[in-house]
């Protein structure tokens, strides 16, 4: 069996598992068969998020005709790691607003979280088609960074998550195409470095070494990046302005992004043993909903192929 099909088969098994009843606390099954349980949050953070969920539910009860109130309940569920509940809620909302790109974008994101990649592609591709008829608008930030305005938009999020869904299934050219569309929606440095990181990865894996080099050409040290510093530093690594030894991974989703970028870079520049070991370790990480961990799982499932034919440095 071709190794390129392994991640697809794993995703199909996971999708089937997503439709089946899960034990209490289990949100999904990882591509390697690991039971993925709701994360344990620090008590103060959990209490705050539960309070905000209760408030969002109350708002929805008062005005169920307001689509945005459905979205906020789904987002609040997601911040608590209750992804299957969020998916069910978005599905109910889509019965009221069929084909709504905002609802499809959020449900597609949560399908990604639970490893239902085919369902994610279906939702996000439908959202992308709907975006052709809908003006772009900035989305409010559910977990804002103090002093930083929201910067991602509907169109950005649709193409970003669609590209990631293709990437984790090994569909590199489709991922490149979606991230290029996403880059066209990016008008700030925070967004640009996030897209540039993934676009570089997809172009490298598709064998487009010249395209990968061109992707990071415009990245500079002095870009206005506060939130996505891991992506920024990784882009400088890809450009040759940093070495892996100079970069350190922190905690949380940002740390997972850095760990994936470092491991993936090691893999594609020829340090295969180091890259594979780091990706296997990341694939087993407790922070399983982060994109870095999802991408690492996918790399392990597809046995780390395909690889470029020569050193991209």
Q: Where are the predicted features?
A:
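Residue-level recognition of tetratricopeptide repeat
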Residues: 75, 109, 164, 201-203, ...
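N-terminal leader/linker segments that initiate helical-solenoid repeat arrays
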Residues: 18-72, 79-80, 305-311
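Short coil turns that delineate tetratricopeptide repeat
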Residues: 64, 98, 132, 153, ...
